[in-house]
């Protein structure tokens, strides 16, 4: 009888310990979640938390052009884009008509919105090709089929990258740049001149587009005074 009571008591103690541990673990999880939601403030600065509007701003305004299933040109604006290596670019994309198109054709072109095309470029980001399949023609833009990939070149954008889809997984598009072409009007000594291209960037904090400014220093040169 005593052995039975001791056994029951031991089981109850174990259950109580487990309950206590679970309660403590839940408290720790809740505390960790609370800490993630409310990061410690940096002294002497305005702290914004993890507000997405300020992450990596300014952002590029890249225009992605594809053919749809009826061979109509489609263009959208994307801002979460960058260079992966010397021949590849990466763009973060959610589900769009553009993603359907590039998965079908395996190709796309990338151009850069500029001061001359602010309204048209913004329109391409506002309106889906699913709703307005002729949106490229609607703004008066024209296209030329790329000779290198199965995608259109938008003639009104003077700098274009012709890309082949390497992969598109979990919203991350990786493209191989097979050719870059530029209109003579934006070149100086045979090189792309940003003062002539006049690309714009997206200011996510102010929700506006901004022009790039003047050169403020020579790359791999301005810092040599500290060597």
Predicted regions and their residues:
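Repetitive helical segments and hydrophobic/amphipathic motifs
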Residues: 11-12
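Short, low-complexity, disordered segments immediately C-terminal to signal peptides
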Residues: 19-34
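Positively charged n-region of N-terminal signal peptides that target proteins for export
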Residues: 1-4
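C-terminal motif of bacterial Sec signal peptides marking the signal peptidase cleavage site
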Residues: 15-17
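Basic, polyanion-binding surface patches
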Residues: 30-227
